[in-house]
């Protein structure tokens, strides 16, 4: 009886959490409810671009809500790890050795600030 109660309590707690992104110790850390927290080492980023328009296709694996897409999705760049609010039309695209990534932040202005921060580290 105790195990199911703990599982339900954990799911309720996780469902109330909001997606978040932060930079800490030269890493981009994404946090999505009920998902692992992937980290991207900033010194491994190459080919970084700030974009106004991106075509997002089907979800391969991940999370898709009205205000947050996170996981692997088809894009105009191929399959990318994305962490975006689809209602914000400013995106940071970059590549690492293993992945193509697409992220944005709370607003177009905050996304541009995040881009400048990443670019200058």
Report residues per predicted region:
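Alpha-helical transmembrane spans
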Residues: 1-18
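Non-cytosolic head/periplasmic domains of membrane-anchored proteins
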Residues: 92-121
């Amino acid at each position: 009886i105790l195990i199911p109660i703990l599982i339900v309590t954990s799911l309720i707690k996780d469902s109330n959490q909001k997606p978040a992104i932060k930079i800490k110790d030269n890493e981009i850390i994404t946090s999505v409810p009920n998902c692992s927290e992937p980290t991207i080492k900033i010194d491994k980023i190459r080919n970084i671009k700030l974009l106004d328009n991106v075509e997002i296709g089907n979800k391969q694996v991940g999370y898709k809500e009205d205000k947050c897409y996170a996981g692997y999705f088809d894009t105009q760049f191929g399959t990318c790890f994305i962490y975006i609010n689809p209602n914000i039309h400013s995106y940071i695209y970059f590549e690492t050795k293993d992945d193509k990534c697409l992220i944005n932040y709370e607003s177009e202005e905050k996304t541009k600030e995040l881009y400048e921060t990443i670019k200058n580290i």
